[in-house]
């Protein structure tokens, strides 16, 4: 994207950010300060930037809160994850989420679960597209790690590996119980 267009990123300040910032092909404006104040400073900086740069075509946000205070009619895309939108229907937080998400052009959900949750909570279905998280494939696993894995799993007949956060809603315990029942 940055090879074809000018990209400007507004991001939170992190120690040693220069190490990362110097490796990318786009401009990063870092915003420091306490979290609550940072939210307002960042939105002020973005609104000011949009006023001064009329060639901006699209805003991409990683969270609905990032768009909450942005005042523009430019195209907006917002990424969503279930934990950040999962507020009881009709609650003040749910109403805030809906007022932001139903006023963006496109919403990118990271799973069918998140898409369905968003729809159930009142987000317009036609705006949602799913892009599942990707992974960086390892071209070759070092022998050391293969040996460690073999040692841990030595003598084990069944091997199940899950790559995810251990979260109640992911139902890991049901999978384990189902596998145990298969064994019997």
Q: For each of these PLM feature ranges, what is it?
A:
Residues 88-91, 119, 134-152:
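Acidic anion/phosphate-binding donor-loop and adjacent secondary structure
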Residues 2-38:
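N-terminal strand-loop element at the rim of the active site
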Residues 136, 165-168, 183-184:
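Nucleotide-sugar-dependent glycosyltransferase donor-binding/catalytic pocket residues
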Residues 38-44, 74-77, 82-103, 144:
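Nucleotide-sugar donor phosphate/pyrophosphate-binding loop at the beta->alpha transition
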Residues 61-66:
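Short His-centered aromatic/hydrophobic patch
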Residues 152-170, 176-179:
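Conserved donor-binding/catalytic core segment of Leloir-type glycosyltransferases
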Residues 13, 113, 134:
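Carbohydrate-associated surface elements
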Residues 59-60, 103-111:
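A short beta-strand/loop micro-motif in the catalytic core of glycosyltransferases
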């Amino acid at each position: 994207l940055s090879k074809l267009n000018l990209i400007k990123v507004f991001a939170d300040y992190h120690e040693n950010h220069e190490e990362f910032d110097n490796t990318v092909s786009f401009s990063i404006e870092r915003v420091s300060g306490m979290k609550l104040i940072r939210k307002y400073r960042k939105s002020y900086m973005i609104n000011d930037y949009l006023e001064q740069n009329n060639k901006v075509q699209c805003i991409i946000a990683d969270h609905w809160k990032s768009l909450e205070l942005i005042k523009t009619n430019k195209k907006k895309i917002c990424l969503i994850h279930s934990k950040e939108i999962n507020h009881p229907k009709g609650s003040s937080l749910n109403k805030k989420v809906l007022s932001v998400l139903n006023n963006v052009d496109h919403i990118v959900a990271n799973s069918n679960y998140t898409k369905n949750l968003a729809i159930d909570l009142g987000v317009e279905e036609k705006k949602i597209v799913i892009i599942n998280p990707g992974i960086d494939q390892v071209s070759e696993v070092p022998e050391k790690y293969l040996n460690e894995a073999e040692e841990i799993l030595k003598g084990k007949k069944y091997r199940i590996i899950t790559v995810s956060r251990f979260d109640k809603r992911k139902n890991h315990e049901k999978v384990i119980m189902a596998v145990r029942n298969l064994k019997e």
